[in-house]
Regions:
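A short beta-loop-alpha structural element at the N-terminal edge
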Residues: 1-15
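Conserved GNAT-fold acetyl-CoA-binding loop/helix
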Residues: 15-40
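A short helix-loop-beta-strand connector motif used in the catalytic cores of GNAT acetyltransferases and
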Residues: 41-52, 70
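Conserved beta-hairpin
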Residues: 48-61, 66
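Conserved acetyl-CoA binding element of GNAT-fold acetyltransferases
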Residues: 66-79, 101-103
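Conserved acetyl-CoA-binding loop-helix of GNAT-fold acetyltransferases
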Residues: 76-78, 82-95, 113-117
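Conserved GNAT acetyl-CoA-binding A-motif
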Residues: 95-107
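Conserved catalytic-core motifs of GNAT/GCN5-like acyltransferases
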Residues: 103-105, 121-137
Length: 148
């Protein structure tokens, strides 16, 4: 079931984020993610609109949208991958926003391919100084302006 996240659930959400982000980004030192917990907890989550996928009273995935349009996080528990949870969460936020953008590590091919399958397209590239990794900037929907 998808529902809005409640701030009292910060502990389980952070635990899911840390486990999932370490699993999804083996090319980044694990210590970086541990050092980022406070920023996620104190800055990003309070500023975001977040929806969770809950199953058997446990959060199995979540999506957070910052600044009304930027997908700052989409994570699914490693034990719940490939069950449609990520797709359902993306579909949920698409119902709330006319367009969305996100940034994904270029080396995270599974995520890049997932976002492509959800209709996102690469618009630009960027560099993350903190992780020393290149990223793709992706957007949904793709520009639908008709050619004349």
């Amino acid at each position: 079931m998808i529902r809005k996240w409640e701030t009292k659930e910060i502990g389980p959400l952070l635990a899911l984020w840390l486990e999932s982000t370490i699993h999804a980004h083996p090319f980044i030192k694990e210590a970086y993610w541990h050092e980022s917990v406070a920023v996620v907890r104190d800055v990003y989550l309070p500023a975001a609109s977040t929806w969770v996928w809950e199953e058997d009273d446990e959060i199995k995935g979540f999506i957070s949208v910052l600044e009304s349009r930027f997908v700052g996080a989409l994570f699914v528990a490693p034990t719940a991958l490939r069950r449609g949870i990520g797709r359902a969460l993306v579909d949920e936020v698409k119902r709330h926003y006319a367009w969305l953008s996100l940034e994904v590590y270029q080396k995270n091919l599974q995520a890049v391919n997932f976002y492509h399958a959800q209709g996102f397209r690469i618009e630009d590239c960027a560099w993350q100084d903190d992780t020393l990794q290149p990223t793709w900037i992706m957007r949904w929907p793709v520009d639908q302006t008709p050619l004349t």
